[in-house]
Amino acid sequence: AVKVVNEGLNSRWYAGSGIYRHVWLMKTDKVHLDEWDTFIDASKVEGKKATVDLHSILHNSGKEKVTAHLKIQIFSPQGEEVYSTTQPVNISGETNIPISLTFDIKKPELWSVDSPSLYTAHLSVKSKKLSDEITVPFGIRTVEFSAEKGFLLNGKPLKLKGGCLHHDNGLLGAVAINRAEERKVELMKANGFNAVRCSHNLPSEYFLQACDRLGLLVIDEVFDQWQQAKRPQDYHQFFDEWSEHDIATMVRRDRNHPSIIMWSIGNEIAERADEPTGEIIARKLIATIHKYDTSRATTAAVNSFWDRRDFSWEKDSERAFRNLDVSGYNYQWKEYEKDHARFPQRIMYGSESVPKEAAQNWNLIDKNSYLIGDFVWTALDYLGEAGLAHTLELAPGEHSPQFMGWPWYNAWCGDIDFCGDKKPQSYYRDILWKRRDISLAVQPPVAKGKREDINYWGWKNEFLSWNWKGYEGETMVVHVYSRSPKVRLYLNNRLLGEKEVNLDTYTASFEVPYEPGQLKAVNLKGKKETTSTELCTTGIPAMIRLTADHTKIKADKNDLSYVKVEILDKNEKLIPDCSVPLEIKSAGKGSVIAAGNGSADDMRSFRSLKPKTFRGKAIAIVQPNTEKGTITLTVSAEGLPEAAIVIETY
């Protein structure tokens, strides 16, 4: 039995409680292998040949000497054997034997974000019978960092289009169901990210496996504090006793993942520049990493010295960076050029940034090789730090808090919400990353006598909507995001105006009196109209649409189907301002384990089967039981026809 006593303030975000990740009890023969002892370094490639170093340990926990044969096989991404060797091993009782060998793979298929090719190593040990066998996936790729060339993956420059990510799974809480972990990676890839910073603790093994399979680069991060506390019951109370063991565990567990490019020793650490404590701890942690892996860079996320009043960035930050291979800057993008002048060999990246400064960040990163990328806080919404990204309308004399109280429950700073949908800042980021030619959003008027206050991590109160009943004739601010020199704006086919785009922010703003209909923004190339986007006023609710990300799932509780619920008008257009109470039912070989929406302050239970839509949408998460068959999900709302969808389990 496991008893959990999780009391006090042990984290700055929602950490979860109990056993929320897979726990495996491994029973082995006396002569056995261990996945975490096995390291396959496939980071050396020259021409059409990869040189692979394989290290492992053979254990004999018995008292008798054993003569065995160790067989090592390497299989290509297509499952073809490309290398094999068998060697005899004599191992005395109660001893361990290190195993090391080097071999070449000709014409290797390199792992990359666009082509994440994975090889497989199969190790087996046999005496009179098979004693043990393990399978270790790995990727062949090279990783290089320099101020002159930037970050190179397989010899090619690549800017890190990154997002920070906490470990929770939104409406599911902290539980790391395999499909939920995989979906996070899919959402990041689908929205232009090629890298993730695991903030600020180790991700699940399955999350890393998904990053390997789908091609998402990873900064693996281990600590949010060292000896000095951020919360009374946080990890600081265990740091001296456990930090070396825990960072070794991170590296031993994760070093075979080709997706991982950096090891991070901490986030916004209080002692980062303290003398001599900060440097002593940093060197110790880095030495432990290098004991188990020297093929990757070390890093940390370093913030300003708001907590050290006698320190300054110019005078003291060098001590926080001097032992690191790559320097992570939390919100300090204004220091990039000054620091490059002082330390021209320093390799930098934005380990945390905010959406409203994204253009300034990316403009610098795009043109400077010593800046290798940026990681927004955050890619996906997460539980805890409630309302960190709020935007409020305040009267004179009112002040905005850093966090929001009940009923706010999620941070609201993600580009992507709990339903997996893009928020306005994600469409803006698409312009920065050249994934979209033009985007359009609408900001309603602030109440008379008030002002809009955007918290530092927040975004202006804008919507991808032209549904503003009751605002007829009132002035809306329409933001057009584009890289074109000029854009035009039309309302119901009337040209409202033509404006130059501010190429520092990729924005042109128009003031438009509201009237229902079609709002259309168009890019101009010279005098020629090119790409366009539009927002249209929709009708009243007429139907419910259900869309499952997977309509066929395994009869296994580690699989899920995320079913999106949308309220449409008679023309099958999403109604973006629609809030409708729903009732969800399921029947068959599974059930709904969570339901809700993307709102940051809708505190009804995630287990409730009566969520409301938020901005026209909600989501139901369906989990199968262990039987093959079908699951039927039905959703109803007052005055609308019931909708149903069938999910097959196999």
Predicted regions, residues:
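Small/polar glycine-rich anion-binding or flexible loop at a beta-alpha turn
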Residues: V446-K448
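Secreted/periplasmic carbohydrate-active enzymes, especially glycoside hydrolases
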Residues: A1-E205, A210, L214-V218, D246-T249, ...
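Substrate-binding/catalytic cleft of secreted carbohydrate-active enzymes
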Residues: H55, R179-A190, N194-L432, A441-Q443, ...
